[in-house]
From Swiss-Prot:
It comes from the Eukaryota. The gene is WFDC5. It holds the Pfam family WAP. Disulfide bonds join C34-C62, C41-C66, C49-C61, C55-C70, C81-C109, C88-C113, C96-C108, C102-C117. GO terms for biological process: antibacterial humoral response; innate immune response. The lineage of its organism: Eukaryota, Metazoa, Chordata, Craniata, Vertebrata. This is WAP four-disulfide core domain protein 5. Residues 1-24 form the signal peptide.
Amino acid sequence: MRIQSLLLLGALLAVGSQLPAVFGRKKGEKWGGCPADDGPCLLSVPDQCVEDSQCPLTRKCCYRACFRQCIPRVSVKPGSCPQDQLRCLSPMNHLCHKDSDCSGKKRCCHSACGRDCRDPARG
């Protein structure tokens, strides 16, 4: 009985170590995403972090105003944004800033003229 328990524990640990790869996350990468960064680069500031594991629990290491820093993560909906083949002739206009600004399964995606809510790409 004891050997079976150890084998089961070993198998669970082996499978658990592969979960980040299965779900597309790197080891040490936290759930969630980084908020959009629309800020201009005003200063050359050294990065405050290199990876998520250097940040407190609810924060991710994200680019913000031209350098990496620990900021609150945002929820990310499943699926990827469709490619936009258009060119914008008007000024950028953002209709959303993060996925939670969009209804249902729609994601906040970059388009030619800014960000807007779109259905995720199929595939």
